[in-house]
Amino acid sequence: MNYLLDLILIPMQVIIVIYTVYYFVLAVIGMWRSRVHKNYTPKNSFAIVVCAHNEEAVVGELVKNLRSLDYPDDLYDIFVVADNCTDKTAEVASAAGANVHERFNKEEVGKGYAMGWMFDRVEKMDRKYDAFLIFDADNLVHPQFMLEMNDHLEKGESVIQG
């Protein structure tokens, strides 16, 4: 009986060991591989869209954070959609330096409608952007974020999630 059990378990263990060694070797090789990261000159323009509903407590900090990024100011604009707000979200965002667009629509409610509405408005503007960046009002962004997005766009990537 033990012989039959050994006949089944030993080949299974050999297969498991082979897979384990294979992935271990891949991990070791991956640790030594040098990754070449090219830093491109900032040239892509971004439309930053922030959708906010009654976010006066946090939207100002986000806009200030976005204004302080390590990226040329003339290559991005910040658009805040104050969606059906009953507080001072629009005033706070505007005071922090954002282009604020207030939207009041009781039938088409929610972030999806607000963002679609804002995308339509931005696309009709005279200035054209290379990419949209989308944030919630309670986000904060690393100072190098837009440089990273620029690098990914320069490599030819069309959709980036960061």
Predicted regions and their residues:
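Short, acidic, metal-binding catalytic loop of nucleotide-sugar glycosyltransferases
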Residues: 64-75
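N-terminal membrane-anchoring/stem segments of glycan-assembly enzymes
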Residues: 1-42
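Short beta-strand-to-loop acidic/aromatic patch adjacent to the donor-nucleotide binding site
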Residues: 125-140
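Conserved donor NDP-sugar-binding/catalytic core segment of glycosyltransferases
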Residues: 143-162
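Acidic helix N-cap motif at the loop->helix transition within catalytic regions
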Residues: 60, 87-94, 102, 144
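Cell-envelope/extracellular polymer assembly enzymes that use nucleotide-activated donors
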Residues: 44-47, 77
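A conserved acidic beta->alpha catalytic loop
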Residues: 82-90, 105-107, 140
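Active-site beta-to-alpha loop of glycosyltransferases that engages the nucleotide-sugar donor
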Residues: 50-63, 84
